[in-house]
């Protein structure tokens, strides 16, 4: 882990985060570079993992507050809306990705540990996320989130080819 650098996403790393995001579709939703940059600019927590100046992982999160709700309404973010109708005082993990060559090295776990620390320091009581069921079920994400004591609070089917599992973890 000592060779990996964890730092906030910035203008120098957003392009590489976007490339990594697109390599992980359909496990994460596709976003344009402009859309991902817009998310970053409106996010409350972001972090990327660098290894030899290469982005090998990242996460972008949003707090449950009026500014975020307004932004999410503007971009019609259905998953955030569904979670905010069911949970309060949460940090929403909008997207996380780790390069396939760097998986099983505890990098995603370290990102989540950092998110938990941020949440505790900001009196946040829950972490939330969604996991794709359709167009393809993201089994590795279910297994990963289960290790962090996430549980399903509901499923939402938006169309014949898009369904998600809404997930929650209590912060102690």
Q: Language-model segments: what does each one mean?
A:
Residues 91, 119-135:
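Conserved GNAT acetyl-CoA-binding A-motif
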Residues 98, 104-119, 147:
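Conserved acetyl-CoA-binding loop-helix of GNAT-fold acetyltransferases
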Residues 2-19:
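A short beta-loop-alpha structural element at the N-terminal edge
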Residues 121, 133-154:
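Conserved active-site alpha-helix within GNAT-family acetyltransferase domains
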Residues 94-103, 133:
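A short, internal acetyl-CoA/4′-phosphopantetheine-binding micro-motif in the GNAT/acyltransferase core
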Residues 154-172:
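C-terminal "cap" of GNAT-fold acetyltransferases
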Residues 60-95:
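Conserved acyl-donor/pantetheine-binding loop and adjacent beta-alpha core of acyl/acetyltransferases
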Residues 26-52, 60:
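Active-site rim helix/loop that mediates acceptor-substrate recognition in acyltransferases
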């Amino acid at each position: 882990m000592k060779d990996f650098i964890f730092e906030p996403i910035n203008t120098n790393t957003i392009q590489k985060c976007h490339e990594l995001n697109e390599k992980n579709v359909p496990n994460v939703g596709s976003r344009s570079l402009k859309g991902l940059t817009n998310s970053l600019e409106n996010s409350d927590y972001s972090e990327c993992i660098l290894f030899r100046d290469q982005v090998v992982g990242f996460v972008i999160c949003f707090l449950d507050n009026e500014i975020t709700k307004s932004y999410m309404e503007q971009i019609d973010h259905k998953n955030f809306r569904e979670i905010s109708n069911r949970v309060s005082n949460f940090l929403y993990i909008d997207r996380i990705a780790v390069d396939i060559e760097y998986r099983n090295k505890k990098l995603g776990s370290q990102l989540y540990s950092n998110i938990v620390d941020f949440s505790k320091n900001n009196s946040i009581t829950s972490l939330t996320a969604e996991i794709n069921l359709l167009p393809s079920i993201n089994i590795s994400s279910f297994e990963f989130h289960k290790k962090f004591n996430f549980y399903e609070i509901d499923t939402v089917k938006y169309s014949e080819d898009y369904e998600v599992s809404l997930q929650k973890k209590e912060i102690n």
